[in-house]
Every structure is written in structure tokens, then in C-alpha cells.
């Protein structure tokens, strides 16, 4: 039983499935464990039912979900969701993707370290990242481009003559410490936002992961919905293969038990929009044709950072959701190499 926030649903279901599997395996003679009851608060119900609908049929049939009231006195059985019901949920379509333009100031900053600095666009300006680590923000106010810098968003300084030395010191420290050649691997600049560092490398050339992927357009930190009521998080990368198949890419650089269920839920969200034609109409991939097939899921992690329970959890997912595991080199900061790729469910 659990009362928690929707964002914790993957952790809850992952740990529960592993406990259920291990306990069932230990019992070699009757009475066998035949059902898994999940008792949750109302806030967790919808995201949990969405994920249970993605499990393989035999396992899904063993699970019953109940909602407990706030006084923890009454249980109400929840009706399971069939897969087809997932596609009936109302969804807002995506707005058309505007052409990305880079301001003069942003171009000048990128030119100081073009292999390290990239830009993330938003409606209200541009965020500059050094190997994925945000360090500056550029906005145009009353026709004048202004730059704010600093790693702490709440304490960024406006770049002017009085702060020029601080700006130069920040760039110097980033060059020294946020580098694959950095000597001090314990430095905060080296350790911070590691997954964003990996994402930034793949954004530059996604074919390092799969030569069949199209380099651009490639969407990073892609949001299929707004708000966090159901624990909605952005997808690390949304890509398109040369054969027209969409690909959901989820990155991890440390062991994470939730990797599999996160990837499966991202598949559900992208597939719901694909079926409605939202992705094609928004021209997320320009005029390239998107195949009428569900997306693939690529789960990426360094070889020694894959969670020990990864395979067992992957085998809980329905086989029509194509999930692939990509093991990459441990020293990926110096360049990404795929060491192994395999279908896991």
C-alpha cells in the first residue's frame, strides 16, 4: 500500500514487481502466489493504471488495483485499463515548431567553444549549455540582447563591464573542469548534470548511437504535455529513423531501477500523439514521413551502470512495445561508442 505523489509511480511499481517476482520464485510448492494487489491513494491511481496496461498479458492478469480512502478504512477496486482505452484519452495537440533562430550574442558565445556549447530555445529566450550544463541565458528586451550568467538560476548576474571578469572566470573554469580531459573528476562542474552531458553529445551526432537515425531534427527534453499532475516528465530525446520509425530515447548514467518503466510510459505518450497525427501535423520532423507504426524505445546507459534488475523488469513489459538496451562505453565523455545493443522484451 502506498500514498504518494504521481511522480513516484515508476519507483513504486518497479519495486513491487521485483518483490512479487522474487517472492513467487521462492515458493516451489502450493499454495502459490496467484495475485498481486496494489493499494494506492487516489492521486496515484491513473498513472498506475496507465503503466499496468503496458505489462505483458499474463502478469497484467495477476494484478488488481485498489484505491484507499484518506482515512485508510475503505478499499475500492479499480477497473483495469485495456490498451485500446489508452488511446481514447483527450490530448492537446502540439503547436507547430517555429524555426529556431540564434541571436548575435548567442552566436558569439558559441563561437568561443563550438564543440562544447549548445543552445536550447524557448519562447522567452535562449539557454546556453556547456556540455549540457546551463550557464547563461540570453533574452531580447526592448530590442536589446541581454545576457545573464551563472550556474544558479536564482543568482545569475547581468553581463556588463562590471561583471566581465566574473564571466571570463566562469568560462575558464568550465573549459578546465567540464571536460573529458579534466583532472579532478570530483569537481562539481565535472559531476553535475551528467545525463545532460551525454544528451548534449548525442544531440550533436545521434548516429553515434544508431547509424539509422536522422541527425536533424532531433528533439531534446521533449514534453508531450504540460504540468506535473500525473508525474509528467520530458523525454530525453525524440528521434526519427531513416525508415520513418519514431524512436524514444531515455538516457541514464547511473543505475536507475525506474529506467524500464519510464521508457515504457514515454512510449505510451508518444504513441498516443502519433495515432492522432499530432506529431506529423506539428511538423516536428519537417516534411519527413512518419511510418504508421508504434515508436521504438532505446534505453541507454554505460555498461557498468545498468541496474541489476533491468532485464527482469524489461521482461514484464508487453512484447509489442519494442524496447532495446544500448550499453555504451564507460568513458563516454570522451566520445560515445555502443558496446552492445539487444532487444530486451
Enumerate the language-model features and the residues they cover:
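Charged, terminal alpha-helix-loop-beta segments
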Residues: 1-345
